[in-house]
Amino acid sequence: MKNNKTLFMFRDRLEAGLLLAAKLKKYKNDPGVVLAVPRGGVPVAYEVAKELGFPVEVVLTKKIGHPTNKEYAIGAASLSDYFIVPHADVTEEYIQQELQRVRSRLKEMYIRFMGDKEPENLKGKTVIVIDDGIATGNTLLGTVNVLRKNNPGKIVIGVPVASKSAVQKLSKEGDEVVAVLIPEEFYGVGAFYEDFKQVSDEEVMFYLDKLRELREAA
């Protein structure tokens, strides 16, 4: 963790996870589940789940990008539901095409990361959704919308860094948004990490396997 002249920066996602875990300790005695947004949220969630002693799963939702800029989220989809922020220049045909593409990918992810494991029962539990950062918040809005259908006791969104606008948006939907950094000027999630390389599927499996081993040994 270093300070430069303009930005507080996390060394990597693991350090960010340690700092976030310290802010989430108050939930340690709750019946809870950590849900990691793949792939970048998994190393962060690894440290949080270790600290809290919660089981961890990947959140099987995926953003739907704007047709002219795929990185700009206009909504999100799960295998059974979806959420879209209306845009005048986004057609229903485009949305349906994206839903088909996204759900095909989600099915592959479910098999790869979770195999034949039954999803955790979220009813009445404190559900902590972890990502490596939030820019617009639109993807997580969709995730929260889907999770509500499982009747959790509480939904907490935990991230190392988030834009002010995203925190305001998500605070209306989640029960709490916990962020290590909410900078006055937001330059994109990656700007607040020294190491922000993409997380591979192999790394996701590594962290999920390590957490399973820790829980089995406990």
Question: Language-model features: where?
Answer:
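PRPP-associated nucleotide enzymes
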Residues: M1-A218
